[in-house]
Amino acid sequence: MEERSKIRVGITHGDMNGVGYEVILKAFSDPTMFELCMPIVYGSPKVAAYHRKALNLQTNFSIINSAEEAQNDKLNILSCTDDELKVELGKPTEEAGKAALDALEKALSDYRDGLIDVLVTAPINKHTIQSESFHFPGHTEYIEERVGGGNKALMILLK
């Protein structure tokens, strides 16, 4: 019998100046996470490396250019932002809002194209993400409009 492929989980990096990368990097520092899924982080390898160093973590990741390149047993980082982003931890910036929206749009496109099975979103700043193409109270409403179909699912897990 052929082994079932792991679920392909798209994870947006959220506000790059917030807790998104910390949560992602710490979660995937546990190798058992890779038994559950194939993670594809939509964001910036440069920003991920910045957070990894700031948090003194050893979490390894692979840089990919498309979701099709993702590999099992690796934290795959799909670059979908400008490489010259400036991280300012804890500070709301327009640049962070644009990076959050860029990651969300790419992840939703890949979801619609069947390249990822589910989407997990890191927290965004609801003020800095506002732009000409984003006039929503938050990204949940944005996702609902973009994906459509009348099927709504939202899960919030807290520990």
Whereabouts are the PLM-identified features?
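Anion-binding alpha/beta catalytic cores of soluble intermediary-metabolism enzymes, centered on
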Residues: 1-159
